[in-house]
Amino acid sequence: MDMDDIFGTARPVSLPTKSAIYVWGYNQSGQTGREGKERQLRIPKQLPPELFGCPAGANSRWLDIACGREHTAAVASDGSLFTWGANDFGQLGDGTEEGRKYPTKVKQLQTEFVKSVSCGAHCTAAIAEPRENDGTISTRRLWVWGQNQGSDFPRLYWGAFPQNTIIRQVSCGAVHVVALSEDGLLQAWGYNEFGQLGRGITCEGLQGARVINAYAKFLDEAPELVKITQVSCGEYHTAAISEKGEVYTWGLGSMGQLGHCSLQSGDKELLPRRVVALDGILIKDVACGGVHTCAVTQKGALYAWGGGQSGQLGLGPQTGFFSCVPNDSKSLLRNIPVLVVPTGVQLVACGNSHTLISSRDGRIHGWGYNSYGQAANEKSSYAWYPSAVDWCVGEVRKLAAGGGHSAVLTDACSLKELCEFRLADSVTPMNASEVGDVASRTGAEALARLCERLREHMLDGGGCGYEDEISGERI
């Protein structure tokens, strides 16, 4: 297969010279893209181009990456979508329920140019444009498949939106999905037993799509329509950012994941409600995990709230009970946003019980549940504080976190980064010291950190005897 068939430039978009996808963590269903029998892969490693049908060493380029509970999806620069991992509910989009441990193109979307993808627990959603479109008019449409989506193949879905509505973003939760239109409207569908659809009521059974048109800015005022710019679905809760940089949350809040000191409906919030603790703070990014939520401010600070039993808030080991006190260090649950990282954060991703961030200095940090190495380089089952993940090179463009695995999409946009990409492919335990020394002297910080991690890994006896993912040999 010709490389341009997969990684061509079918759209006039700005592309890096090369991209890399790193996937690691829990691998029971092959969600890391390796065909081996390893149950877990604790070291991030680039997925080689040949996995996607390209020649070894090809300059692969990627647009997006997403993680579900046990499946993964990636968008190539030519608009092709690849999926792999668990498929028990048809979430891979191939019309079967057979899992795959290697990436395969979703053939039913070959007439579409996929722009972005989102993975829920057992479903997948993608935003795409028809390939015959000349690119002068945006026609971004929504495709869904998997659990509760009515098909094991991708199907075009308008829901409550009028046909030809331009879809800006989609986010999938455990059993619900929310889509954002270019006009700033949200529509939600799926299960609503905890109010995660934002309708003001709870419902039994699968619910069709409906536009969310009531947002509670103040409890003593009537709800009103708010223009939304971003949305994120957690397991049973939802968060959104308004055009004014405000955060609204709704759904299950029993673990403090909504960020409200008190809830209006027992352990739930049935309508989108503004997180007043963040008043005056402009938020640019929000991410929902299983029972926690994180937000990044315009100035690069990270706030977190919700359940912290596994360390997913990054605040250290905690014992105690629910607390409304913002700085109560004994609280197991933080139902009011607390500052975790004061500055420098660019991106955040929340998995079921772990969190990843990337910083302006190009580094990645993770924390939370770590039994499969999905959060940090540490051997421990819990990473209580932000811990560096120094196995990736290139400029971080996207972070993704799933049930027990993680993924990073990086770009090489400069000659230095391209050289780091090339050298990283050839680093082994035998030459790590030499390459690392040269990298340090020439300012190749990411490559130097990778080599240092590998040296530490060697001194540590190969990390508890697991297979070394850099050299392919047991150290």
Regions found by a protein language model. Name each.
Residues 474-475:
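Acidic, low-complexity intrinsically disordered termini and linkers
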Residues 1-414, 426:
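Eukaryote-biased RCC1-like beta-propeller repeat architecture
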